[in-house]
């Protein structure tokens, strides 16, 4: 579990007097770290009792071609670039903004697989 509340330490190292304790709403979760593999999703309870779908592994992506306006489900071959972290390329992690190689060519991921549960991408010309 991650606690994402405000720190009780000042920049100088002194302490703020805590006005209250920790709250359940301030707890975070570990990142999904979606990678290429047989489809696997996880349901997570979120604020208000809603459900968020996390993609843990994915095989296919919905790739849109902006010039023709056609969207197709294609197989993901590998991750070629990832500006978020160079190590994600080696580990084949899928994040928003990553450039993947598909059957149609290179595509940039536009969705957040760990938040949305799907992988939407657009072809890079």
Curated annotation (Swiss-Prot):
UniProt keyword terms in alphabetical order: Ribonucleoprotein, Ribosomal protein
PROSITE patterns named in the record: RIBOSOMAL_S8E
GO molecular function ontology, one term from the record: structural constituent of ribosome
GO term, biological process aspect, one: translation
Xref: InterPro entries: Ribosomal_eS8 (IPR001047), Ribosomal_eS8_CS (IPR018283), Ribosomal_protein_eS8_arc (IPR020919), Ribosomal_Se8/biogenesis_NSA2 (IPR022309)
One Pfam family matching this protein: Ribosomal_S8e
GO CC annotation terms, alphabetical: ribonucleoprotein complex; ribosome
PANTHER family: 40S RIBOSOMAL PROTEIN S8 (PTHR10394)
Family recorded in the similarity comment: Belongs to the eukaryotic ribosomal protein eS8 family.
Subunit structure: Part of the 30S ribosomal subunit.
Name of the protein in question: Small ribosomal subunit protein eS8
